[in-house]
Each structure stands twice: as C-alpha cells, then as structure tokens.
C-alpha cells in the first residue's frame, strides 16, 4: 500500500513539474510568433570581394542564425525582433537611425557590415518572401510572419530582391 501511495505521489509531482515547465514561459504566454533567419550565403560566391580579415566570420554554410521562432508583442517591428533575437543569441548587430527614412538602418550583423563585400553590399530583409521598400522600423509584424535577413553583394539582385521593379 505504501508503494502504491508513493508511486501516486511521484506521478502527481511529475505531472506538476511537466505542467510548470510547459512549452510556454510566463513571458511567452499569449505572445505572437514569427520566424527569423539571418543569412550571408551570397558572400560564399564572392569571397574574392570580401575585405581582408572578414573571411573568418563567414560561416561555412552562410547561415548566421537558422530559422528561429521568436515571440513578439502587438506593434513590434522587424527591427524590434532583430534586436531581440540578436541579443538573445549573442550575435553582434549595429544600426543607426536614418531620419530621412524614419527608420533604423542595419549597418552590420555578425560583424559583417555594409560594403564589406563590395560597393553594392549590405543587409536587406524580406517578410513572407516580399522585399519591402521601406525601413525595418516601419514594418509592423503579424503573427506567423517569416522574416529573412540577407546579406547582398549586388544591391539585392543576388538574393532575389526586385526593388524598384513592378
């Protein structure tokens, strides 16, 4: 009888622990979610154009952050989520505010900066496969969005961006 009672108590404790340690945290409860990926794979095809000393920071597969699910709040922008995910993952990110565009401009991610791979290189973002023609601070995310930050070596042509085209 004592063994049965101990087993029952153990099962109750296990159930309590599983409930307390579920998939969502207090901070995550009721949050919206998107996925974020950061890639610089185009650099792999342009290593000769890369500034000296930068080759060591480019991952072998060109992926700085694999597709990662991120919780966000109503009203958060692509920039807000980029800041949060980079901080959480220990990825260096540098930006500056650009008044002309009323948005943050991403200068560098993972120590890979604009112009590190030629005059037409820098960071661009897409959401759900679309390349917005405005800054990342101006794009308010929706639940389920997929954000990809891509390093371009050719003003977006090498990553599939069709900026300025109908």
Segments from the language model and where they lie:
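Ubiquitin-like/PB1-type beta-grasp interaction modules and other compact soluble beta-rich domains
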Residues: 2-8, 12, 16-166
